[in-house]
């Protein structure tokens, strides 16, 4: 069986994309079915033919602006049947791009207010 060619794409201006992207990559590297490539903070990766070799994109990106060429590259690639996994801040990417937000199925508005709460460990096993 061929491995799933997977692009781990991390970047943006708010979250620690380097640390989190590396962690995502390391976790996924334990899956023998995946052939991984990592790209950090380079939106040209979303332009065809750069996405063409991949079957799956694991997307950890925050905020930013996407050009029409990048948007069309990503949306057409997904529409062709390829896989998109948006991680955490993916819903807060490309705020001014309604087509991207429609593909993701929603968007980030705000974090709730911080508050104190109690955690009870019932069963540590």
Q: Across the structure, where does each feature detected by a protein language model lie?
A:
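Short catalytic/ligand-binding loop motif for oxyanion handling, primarily in non-cytosolic enzymes
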Residues: 16-17, 46, 66-67, 92-97, ...
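Short secondary-structure boundary/capping segments
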Residues: 48, 76, 109-111
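A generic structural signal for well-ordered alpha-helical segments
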Residues: 28-29, 77-78, 100
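An acidic, glycine-rich "communication" segment
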Residues: 2, 90-125
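Short alpha-beta junction capping motif
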Residues: 8, 51-94
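Aromatic-Pro/Gly-enriched surface loop or interdomain linker
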Residues: 1-53
């Amino acid at each position: 069986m061929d491995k799933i060619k997977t692009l781990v794409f991390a970047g943006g201006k708010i979250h620690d994309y380097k640390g989190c992207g590396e962690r995502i990559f390391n976790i996924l590297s334990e899956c023998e079915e995946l052939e991984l490539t990592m790209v950090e903070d380079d939106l040209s990766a979303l332009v065809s033919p750069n996405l063409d070799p991949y079957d799956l994109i694991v997307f950890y990106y925050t905020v930013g602006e996407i050009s029409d060429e990048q948007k069309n590259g990503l949306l057409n690639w997904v529409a062709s049947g390829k896989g998109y996994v948006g991680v955490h801040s993916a819903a807060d990417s490309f705020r001014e791009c309604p087509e991207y937000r429609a593909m993701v199925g929603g968007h980030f508005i705000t974090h709730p207010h911080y508050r104190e709460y109690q955690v009870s460990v019932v069963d540590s096993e």
